[in-house]
Amino acid sequence: MSNNNNEAQQPVESTNVESQQNVVQSDCPVVNENNDNNNNNNNNNNNNNNNNNNNNNNNNSNNNNNSSNNENNENNENNSCEKSEQEKPKEPEEPVQEEKSKEPCDQQKVKENEPAEEKETEPAAPVEPENPLSNDSAASEKLQEQHQQQNHEPQQTSNGESNEADANESENKKRSIDEAGDIKDGKKRKVETVETSDPAQQVEA
């Protein structure tokens, strides 16, 4: 009887162990799946982080490229501006320098030939060219009369006679006309005098 009891108990124990093993085995794959999913997620996150880092690196490199391009553009603009500035003033500078260089040379020549001090002290008298009609007595007399009126000095004619008498006569006529008051500034005017006892107190109206 005891043997039978033992035999009957053994399969119960075996079934219990099998059921426990089955439970453990059924739980294990679930845990493994979760771990796999977590690992996959972590890997994906790492990949995303790497991608983000790569993108950041790319952005940085793009920014660097943009900055270098901007610098190149500025350099190009500066170069073009410098070229245009250098080309523009070349044309007007050359004649200006030539004119400036001519002036001091001319002034130096004038100073060497005729000192400035002598020019200031000398009277500004016009130098007349030689008259080709000097042989003509009428033309020479007219020229001498013009000089006589300007300078009020007696001069000789081509015949050797002095014009001093003519000059004195014309001056006397002018004085008599001005004193009489008949003509003033080329216009005739009337002079009315108020007679008084004292001739020095006569008033001209």
Curated annotation (Swiss-Prot):
Biased composition (Polar residues): 1-25, 194-205
Region (Disordered): 1-205
Protein name per its UniProtKB record: Uncharacterized protein DDB_G0285917
Biased composition (Basic and acidic residues): 80-122, 170-185
Sequence ranges of Low complexity compositional bias: 32-79, 123-132, 146-162
